[in-house]
A protein has these predicted regions:
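Short amphipathic alpha-helical interface segments
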Residues: 2-41
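Short amphipathic alpha-helical interaction segments
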Residues: 42-57
């Protein structure tokens, strides 16, 4: 039986969605499409919410108006090494 991802792993999966969109600090994604991409990759709604909460608590993401998720400088710093790896 597969183990469930930790909230940190889910948060990093959400950051990976920003990375796939070539996002930078202060870029915004709509929560709905981000959630859809997360679930398409095998995650659940509960895992997405747990990851989002973890990322917000750690200053990686901010929840904005109109169902948006904003990548912070701290969040960008977390994904930046992954964006430059081969």
């Amino acid at each position: 039986m597969a183990t469930l991802p930790t909230p940190e792993e889910s948060a990093r999966a959400i950051l990976a969605i920003f990375a796939l969109n070539n996002s930078h600090a202060d870029d915004v994604l709509m929560a709905g499409p981000a959630n859809f991409a997360f679930r398409q990759a095998g995650g659940s709604e509960a895992e997405f919410q747990a990851g989002l909460e973890y990322a917000v608590q750690n200053g990686w993401l901010e929840i904005g108006e109109n169902n948006t998720i904003k990548l912070t400088n701290a969040g960008f710093a977390e994904i930046k090494p992954d964006k430059n790896s081969n």
